[in-house]
């Protein structure tokens, strides 16, 4: 069944409250990490997104049984490993699936994993994953588009990441948790999703010290127990709706948020002239009657401005009179939103990973998302325009935003996605 496009009749102010969904980027590695235990694990706050279903399909292939026990609660049980390969058909859909290698190395001692996929914006290598594994005693070779890895004993030693990498840090952690070795990781990522993974593993009996710092020490344990865990809220979705409120010059309350995870986004919006009030688990974003100012933005690893919010910020700045400069050295090719925003009247000039944005008024147009966050930029732009924008490529939005049209309507937007019409059988 082909997905129908998202329609947005723009020009409305947003209002009310929106509950931010659990973090997809935290949920995916935690689902993978659950197979390190042979006992049942129950996760609360699991978003029902296409990427989650993909990782569950991969986990099922490995040997995990799962059951949804509530709207966002999931129980997983992996009593034994049935397969030690991660097939291309699944891994090619999503980059996060590459961390299955670390989990399989820990639990089964070997793994064959295809090169990862995901959103198609540039080359995002896994060389830091591979270098870390080799430094810690894993034998790993690449052959025919697959990485084949095995370990003879427990991982031991130290590794210094050459650059901050969320997935590389997570993969090395997963591979090191079981056994009797001691592993030290330097220049490790302090991203919120890494910290949530560490907290989850420690809740099952892992011994990982240094979460939230750039130095991690992992002492292997014989086995992990089962347990329950609640996943953190999605700071990228929260940032998206904060920017949507600013773009529509609205007042919006976000619930189920961690304000401390959003300081970089909050800081830039306040620099533009948006009022932001933080309370426990809530953020109030107020851009009503504001003459917003242009700003310069450069993406960085957490706690800096997130690359996953760069396209959305670019869409906002395209509506703000004056010159803004947006630079994304984290993922320099994350620019697929630019051509589509041009179709809506945006004035954006690109040089390398730098966008120079001359803000103005956007107009409705048919557009197509080529990746998840480009899709978010397009729906934000559509909310600001007079007229109806039709957004193709909804499958990408479904990777990161649950029930998007319904939730946009709940805060005052005129958004809908027509039901697909099934052709009748021919005689």
Curated annotation (Swiss-Prot):
Q: Which residues form the active site?
A: 119
Which Pfam families does the record match to this protein?
A: EPSP_synthase
Entries under InterPro entries matching the protein: Enolpyruvate_Tfrase_dom, Enolpyruvate_Tfrase_sf, MurA_subfamily, RNA3'P_cycl/enolpyr_Trfase_a/b, UDP_GlcNAc_COvinyl_MurA
Positions bearing 2-(S-cysteinyl)pyruvic acid O-phosphothioketal: 119
- Which EC class, in a word? transferase
Q: Does the record carry Cell division as a key word?
A: yes
Q: What is its main location?
A: cytoplasm
Localization, UniProt: Cytoplasm
Where does this protein act, in terms of pathway?
Answer: Cell wall biogenesis; peptidoglycan biosynthesis
- Listed GO biological process terms: cell division; cell wall organization; peptidoglycan biosynthetic process; regulation of cell shape; UDP-N-acetylgalactosamine biosynthetic process
Give the binding site residues for phosphoenolpyruvate.
24-25
Superkingdom of this entry's organism? Bacteria
The keyword NAD is annotated on this UniProt entry: no
Which key words are in the record? Cell cycle, Cell division, Cell shape, Cell wall biogenesis/degradation, Cytoplasm, Peptidoglycan synthesis, Pyruvate, Transferase
Q: Name one GO cellular component term.
A: cytoplasm
The family classification in the record reads: Belongs to the EPSP synthase family. MurA subfamily.
Question: What does the protein in this record do?
Answer: Cell wall formation. Adds enolpyruvyl to UDP-N-acetylglucosamine.
The cross-references to NCBIfam families, in alphabetical order and at most eight, read:
murA (TIGR01072), PRK09369.1 (NF006873)
Q: Spell out the protein name for this chain.
A: UDP-N-acetylglucosamine 1-carboxyvinyltransferase
**Source organism per UniProt:** Deinococcus geothermalis (strain DSM 11300 / CIP 105573 / AG-3a)
Gene name for this UniProt entry: murA
